[in-house]
Swiss-Prot record:
<dbReference type="GO" id="GO:0009252">
    <property type="term" value="P:peptidoglycan biosynthetic process"/>
</dbReference>
<dbReference type="InterPro" id="IPR001986">
    <property type="entry name" value="Enolpyruvate_Tfrase_dom"/>
</dbReference>
<keyword id="KW-0670">Pyruvate</keyword>
<dbReference type="InterPro" id="IPR050068">
    <property type="entry name" value="MurA_subfamily"/>
</dbReference>
<keyword id="KW-0808">Transferase</keyword>
<comment type="function">
    <text>Cell wall formation. Adds enolpyruvyl to UDP-N-acetylglucosamine.</text>
</comment>
<protein>
    <recommendedName>
        <fullName>UDP-N-acetylglucosamine 1-carboxyvinyltransferase</fullName>
        <ecNumber>2.5.1.7</ecNumber>
    </recommendedName>
</protein>
<dbReference type="GO" id="GO:0008360">
    <property type="term" value="P:regulation of cell shape"/>
</dbReference>
<keyword id="KW-0133">Cell shape</keyword>
<feature type="binding site">
    <location>
        <position position="327"/>
    </location>
    <ligand>
        <name>UDP-N-acetyl-alpha-D-glucosamine</name>
    </ligand>
</feature>
<keyword id="KW-0961">Cell wall biogenesis/degradation</keyword>
<feature type="binding site">
    <location>
        <begin position="22"/>
        <end position="23"/>
    </location>
    <ligand>
        <name>phosphoenolpyruvate</name>
    </ligand>
</feature>
<keyword id="KW-0132">Cell division</keyword>
<dbReference type="InterPro" id="IPR036968">
    <property type="entry name" value="Enolpyruvate_Tfrase_sf"/>
</dbReference>
<dbReference type="InterPro" id="IPR005750">
    <property type="entry name" value="UDP_GlcNAc_COvinyl_MurA"/>
</dbReference>
<feature type="binding site">
    <location>
        <begin position="122"/>
        <end position="126"/>
    </location>
    <ligand>
        <name>UDP-N-acetyl-alpha-D-glucosamine</name>
    </ligand>
</feature>
<dbReference type="GO" id="GO:0051301">
    <property type="term" value="P:cell division"/>
</dbReference>
């Protein structure tokens, strides 16, 4: 099993190209199920979760071509199977996103209840509630969601909670429904907006994009299109935190600064000098970062997927910071590992109190989920001595060539078996 070996060695300096967004690419690839035509996607990150999605779609009978790196062509002219099996869904929660488009276009779908991260229950009840409101018959049998509908019909659906996956599934399903669907309390995340823009490129009629009220007029069919996946705001944020922690100067290319203003604001609060253009971000940190308080909330507030990384910055910051996690339970699994490296973090319920220390010490640590593993990598960049991060298969789900990208800006980091 691969590990990362890191030796702390001072500031990061240089340019990093940000990859396409995993959390946008996954639903956008599933949107290919909505048309018999060929979809061509660019800026697709080469990640474990993308490979899993490719396997899932191919298993259903979709033709997937990946002739060029970061490009993918999908043709779902017919499906051999309307089932998404447990063997694949258990490894990645986003597999549930085939439910809406498959049901809408083919009249039935069977999808295993999801697995994926160990950071909380993340139920799919809002997905099911919405599909039932649109006329589907839905049952849960032997761990599978089974849905049928001759043709979905438009409905007004009020989400009980903000759910990114639920919004995406219902948005895709509504594009082929009869009549108008209104999604109230819809997620506003940039990745949802990216999916909506892709659907519009395919011929969908959607208004309110970027707001919490999406109005979708169903059409009889969608057509093929070419679409570029948006840059990954979480990968970008991770590299910016690494730059700030190491007191370096990093410039991110192919970035989307407007999608991550809450993160940039917090980094400015730590003392970082940040400049942005349309597709680039520059961070320069001259001194020890200042500790910051922050709370995770749905977009446009601070994202839960950046919680572990900014908490890690607090570990070596001047002062103390209070971190409150409101999105997922059980999302402090990186805390014991950071404390093993010399951090001073106390957890009370969904709040962590982080007191900055002068230095961290290298240690062997274990990744528990995708973003926790990223936090341990950036902790290793500033720790004295050698850090070994184990179980980095979590990291490979969401970061493309992280050791190469960090190595190119001065980090001493390598993948070892």
């Amino acid at each position: 099993m691969d590990k990362l070996k890191i030796i702390g060695n001072g500031p990061l300096n240089g340019e990093i190209r940000v990859s396409g967004a995993k959390n946008a690419a996954l639903p956008i690839l599933c949107a290919g199920l909505l048309t018999a035509d060929t979809m061509r996607f660019t800026n697709v990150p080469m990640l474990r979760d993308i490979a899993t999605t490719q396997k899932l779609l191919q298993g259903m009978g979709v033709r997937v071509m990946t002739d060029n790196v970061h490009e993918m062509e999908i043709t779902a002219s017919h499906l051999d199977s309307l089932v998404a099996p447990y063997e694949l869904v258990k490894t990645m929660r986003a597999s549930i996103l085939v439910l809406g488009p498959t049901l809408a276009r083919f009249g039935e779908a069977t999808v295993s209840l999801p697995g994926g991260c160990a950071i909380g229950s993340r139920p799919v009840d809002q997905h099911i509630k919405g599909l039932v409101a649109m006329g589907a018959e839905v049952s849960i049998e032997h761990g599978y969601v089974k849905a049928r509908a001759k043709r979905l019909r438009g409905a007004r659906i009020v989400m009980d909670m903000v759910t990114v996956g639920g919004t995406e599934n219902l948005l895709m399903a509504a594009t082929l429904a009869e009549g108008t669907t209104i999604l109230e309390n819809a997620a506003r995340e940039p990745e949802v907006t990216d999916l909506a823009n892709c659907l519009v490129a395919m011929g969908a009629k959607i208004s309110g994009i970027g707001t919490d009220r999406l109005v979708i007029e169903g059409v009889d069919k969608l057509h093929g299109a070419e679409y570029a996946v948006m840059p990954d705001r979480i990968e970008a944020g991770t590299f910016l935190v690494a730059g700030a922690m190491t007191r370096g100067h990093v410039v991110l290319k192919n970035a989307a600064p407007k999608s991550m203003e809450a993160v940039l604001d917090k980094l400015r609060e730590t003392g970082a000098l940040i400049e942005c253009g349309d597709d680039w971000i520059s961070l320069d940190m001259k001194q020890r970062p200042k500790a910051v308080n922050f709370r995770t909330l749905p977009y446009p507030a601070f994202p839960t997927d950046m919680q572990a990384q900014l908490m890690t910055l607090n570990c070596v910051a001047d002062g103390a910071g209070v971190v409150t996690e409101t999105i997922f339970e059980n999302r402090f699994m990186h805390v014991p590992e950071l404390n093993r490296m010399g951090a001073n973090i106390e957890v009370e319920g969904n709040t962590a109190i982080v007191k900055g220390v002068d230095k961290l010490s290298g240690a062997t640590v274990m990744a528990t989920d995708l973003r926790a593993s990223a936090s341990l990598v950036i902790a290793g960049l500033v720790a004295e001595g050698e850090t070994i991060v184990d179980r980095i298969y979590h990291l490979d789900r969401g970061y493309e060539y992280i050791e190469k990208k960090l190595g190119a800006v001065g980090a001493l980091i390598e993948r070892v078996s």
